[in-house]
């Protein structure tokens, strides 16, 4: 994500330079910050171990956005063993300070450009019906790649223990152009 000039006060037409974010592979040292970002948002918070483990074993298919040394966004993802042409996005987290700037889409696009994702033709994620932001993001991804976004039922709420988890629907974007 490159630095962009933004007008923050239209009356005075003041221009400011927004920070240049670094989009890169995560390291195990980033795992705790990813966990903290998930915990401070409305995301399902997995154990801190999950984030550290994803950084160690799935760094080729995960990405972090940093403002200096601070993690301000991340994606945890993997290539399912039975779907080698698909990148499954487990979680996307964006700090409140970065929301509405297109960082989620930038992270996905940077991720699918990687050598490890050269055979990826589809992006999949599961999204709850109430998560309108993620639904909009995946539809925007499809539009930006001029491809389809198919939505299908995946995990019903009955599969989750307790009664506090919504149904998860699969969003499948693709085929992506090679």
UniProtKB/Swiss-Prot annotation:
Enzyme class, UniProt record, top EC level = transferase
- Give the transmembrane ranges: none
Which GO terms fall under molecular function for this chain's record? diaminobutyrate acetyltransferase activity
Provide the E.C. number(s) assigned to this enzyme: 2.3.1.178
The name this protein carries in UniProt is: L-2,4-diaminobutyric acid acetyltransferase
Under the heading SUPFAM superfamilies, the entry gives: Acyl-CoA N-acyltransferases (Nat)
Q: Coiled-coil segments, which residues?
A: none
- Report domain N-acetyltransferase positions: 21-174
Q: Which UniProt keywords apply?
A: Acyltransferase, Transferase
Pathway the protein contributes to: Amine and polyamine biosynthesis; ectoine biosynthesis; L-ectoine from L-aspartate 4-semialdehyde: step 2/3
Q: Which domain of life does the UniProt lineage start with?
A: Bacteria
Per the record, the similarity remark reads: Belongs to the acetyltransferase family. EctA subfamily.
For this protein, the record's Pfam families field holds: Acetyltransf_1
State the signal peptide span: none
GO BP terms in the entry? ectoine biosynthetic process
């Amino acid at each position: 994500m490159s630095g962009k000039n933004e007008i923050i006060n239209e009356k005075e037409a003041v221009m400011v330079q927004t920070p240049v974010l670094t989009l890169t592979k995560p390291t195990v040292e980033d795992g705790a910050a990813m966990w903290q970002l998930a915990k401070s948002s409305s995301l399902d918070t997995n154990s801190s171990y999950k984030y550290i483990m994803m950084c160690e074993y799935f760094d080729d298919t995960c990405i972090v956005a940093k403002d200096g040394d601070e993690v301000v966004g991340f994606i945890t993802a993997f290539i399912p063993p039975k779907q080698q042409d698909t990148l499954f996005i487990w979680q996307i987290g964006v700090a409140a300070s970065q929301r509405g700037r297109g960082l989620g889409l930038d992270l996905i696009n940077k991720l699918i450009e990687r050598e490890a994702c050269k055979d990826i033709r589809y992006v999949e994620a599961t999204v709850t019906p109430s998560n309108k932001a993620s639904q909009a993001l995946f539809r925007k991804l499809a539009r930006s790649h001029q491809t389809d976004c198919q939505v299908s039922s995946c995990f019903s709420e009955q599969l989750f223990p307790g009664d506090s988890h919504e149904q998860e629907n699969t969003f499948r974007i693709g085929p992506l152009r090679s």
